[in-house]
Amino acid sequence: MDKKVAVVTGAGSGIGRAIATELSYRDFHVIVTDLNEQAAKDVAATLPSARAVKCDVTLPTDSVAVANSVKEIEKRLDVWVSNAGVSKMAKFLDIDEKMYDFTLDVNLKGVFFASQAGARAMIELKTKDARIINIASMAAKAGRVPFLADYVASKFGVLGLTQAMAYELAPNDIRVNSVCPGFVSTPMQVRELAWEADLRGISPEDVKKMWIKDTPLGRLELPEDVAKVVGFLTSKDSEFITGEAIAVNGGAFMD
């Protein structure tokens, strides 16, 4: 495989799809993974060099299987993007153990073991200048997000995990960073608009106006806004960046 190889989890739609497309534009061969196998195949079919693999990130064995297939088929792995994530809005006092466990299983455990599988493969393949990118959230930088306490906890965890990984994996020539999106126009956001509207007793359109008002640059974020930053983190220009959490949110939250 002459092209660089990237794995993107949760790439069947939304931010993950945009990341897969951006990396393809940057001449990567992309492994498009998703729990929805058909969605992964549909995305892979739009890219010049890609293949699709079904992957449930809540099952560490699935992530290991993806990494092993890359070692066997492509025989190189340059970039791993742990993007798969979920959210469901509820008041803190209404979040039960089942809801909490599901959110943490996907958003934190899923990132932990997916990125671990990628790192192991990179080390075994002796990859030089390897990159791992964990998709976090603006909610990882500001806990004052309503109706998402379990989600906030999971994304704060991703930031801590990213720093720990960056420190431990630096001797293996692996850089690890996270990206923190804000209010992104995705299928997930459509559901979030409806949930927040119901919880607040207002219309989804009013919630959308609130989100835009809270974003100084005056619009909702696009998946491509996130993907471009991920692309930068895979480039030579970012070779001395590791352990960082880069906010991409139009100013909705500022460090």
Predicted regions and their residues:
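Residue(s) in the substrate-gating loop at a strand-loop-helix junction
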Residues: 137
